[in-house]
Amino acid sequence: MNTVSSTLISLTATCLLLFSPRQASAGTDQPAAPADTVETAEPQILRLTDDDYKAVAEELGVEVAAIKAVVDIEAGRNHQGFFAPGKPLINFDLTMFRQHARRKGINLSRYSKSHSIVFSSPDARKYGSTQSAQQERLKTARSIDDHTAVQGTFWGMFQIGGFNWKLCGCSSIEEFVERMSKSEREQLELFGNFIRNIGLDQALRNKNWAAFARRYNGPSYARRGYHTRMASAYNRHKKLEKASAENDSSKEKE
């Protein structure tokens, strides 16, 4: 074999090694990644689906539109339960935090300077958004006392107080936070457990918005119009359901 032939064979073998079958199937001429390389997906927020709504509505014996009406009022304009993956929307309540700290004998005055963010209004300008500031307040408050901070915060798309963790069917505060941080379906399940355990499922079943709002939102519900807003939201979702059903029926006839 002459020198030229030997060189060509060597080059061909090298090309075959560099361009593997895995590259060919991927349609690329870049060197293939090692076989044991695992591509990891970015963390994602697991949103509620129609099937999620239907499943929990069936468990509670209520209409899907009734649950969606509560979401419209409690979950803010975006109707979502998360600020970022693993970070549920929260509302840190300083008054509630103080109450639970007092019950545990925690002297919060010791932390007024070292943990000043906890005791001031959320600074949206400094942290980029009000929710970012709230997340930082909660994080700092948890460094004072974890359970007290969780109890002094309202969580997720249904804004359930952390002090209600047992009524949500959780065995511990840690389980409550873990489930709240997992998905919107988990938040919906916790909401279902909560209203069932305090007897509010009946009010939701009967569309008694005043009774529901009085217990869920407190005595100032009427002044804030929670009951009338829920009623309007329910009617809106029923109209959407009807329009969707009529559209599906028309498609079937075509």
Regions found by a protein language model. Name each.
Residues 20-30:
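Signal peptide processing junction and immediate N-terminal pro/mature segment
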Residues 1-9:
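Bacterial N-terminal signal peptides that target proteins for export
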Residues 28-254:
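Catalytic glycan-binding domains that act on GlcNAc-containing polysaccharides
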Residues 9-19:
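Bacterial N-terminal signal peptides
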Residues 12, 23-25, 242:
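Residue-level detector of intrinsically disordered, flexible termini
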